[in-house]
Amino acid sequence: MFHSVDVLSGRILYSKEAQAWPDFERQLAALRRAQQAFAARPVIERAALLHDLADKLAQARSRLAEMVCEEVGRCLRECEAELDKSVALIRYYARLAPQLLAHKTIATQASLSQVRFEPIGVVLAVMPWNYPVWQVLRFAVPALCAGNACLVKPAPSVARVTAALFELVGEHLPFQAAWLDHDDTLRAIEHTDAMAFTGSTATGRRLAAHAGQHLKKSVLELGGSNAFIVMPDADLAAAAKEACYSRFRDAGQSCNAAKRIIVAEAVADEFVPLFLAECAKLQMGNPMDAATTLAPLHREDLRARVHAQVQDALAHGARALCGGQLPRGSGW
């Protein structure tokens, strides 16, 4: 079952049943037929359809941004920025596709040598919840430009905005959602032509291993523990401001957030108060409120995990210089 939940109230906003495997097989067969017809069209025609999608996405900006805000929990202005970035991405690839995909003649010892770009077929993407519009389009748009069909298995907790996005896509692009449970997602890898995944390292290992067993191409973007490093000659005020932004932007729920802040010992005593002063400026609250700068976490279990990590660190000798307690009020 796919559920979208309001991060402030816990209220279920949208529910969708996972599709049965025979339904997916029929969907995949139809998508393969659509992909063949789509790939036969000139690149400029495929690009025109993507420009149309960009127009629709721009028109739906406010509505989709509010959905992302409610479901994911990020501040509304951050969700609006996600929509703007997504529109720009579509226009970028649609504009450059004829140039990027043009056949190229290259010099070799043969009488004629060319580089030609051919579609793979149907590509499956297993996508995360943190940027439910951007992550899907970042994967799909270049693949569509190249004449592929795209199937997206969304994260269960962003079902509503995913459904709204695919309503905009319509029937002119071979680009659909696959509402699969975990086991059927593994089976889908076997029946599609390539797989893309964004998410945790542990899940990426499992999916990549399954793709490898069936000789399917895979592209992975996996989680990390990025370090923000402050050197002795840094502008400490600027570094403190950027460190706070990098750690707490999108409530810290992004792959490129500063997971660790490493400060040269020579400047640590000076840096820490500057960083704490920046943290003190953060305003927790309703992510729809323009005054809010620190939005809720996405799910209750994620908040519980973060709190447990803080308590474990304190139990092992760490000191909490600010925060350290669960905030009162609604939301996570």
What residue spans do the PLM features occupy?
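ALDH superfamily catalytic-core signature
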Residues: 202-332
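Rossmann-like NAD(P) dinucleotide-binding subdomain of oxidoreductase/dehydrogenase enzymes
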Residues: 102-238
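A conserved hydrophobic position in a structured secondary element of the catalytic/binding core
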Residues: 5, 199, 263
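Hydrophobic face of alpha-helices
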Residues: 28, 47-54, 65, 87, ...
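N-terminal Rossmann-like NAD(P)+-binding subdomain of aldehyde/semialdehyde dehydrogenases
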Residues: 1-111, 298
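Structural signal for hydrophobic packing residues in well-ordered secondary-structure cores
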Residues: 35, 39, 54-61, 65, ...
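Short phosphate-engaging motifs
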Residues: 23, 60, 64, 86, ...
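Residue-level signal for inorganic ion chemistry
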Residues: 10, 46, 68, 90, ...
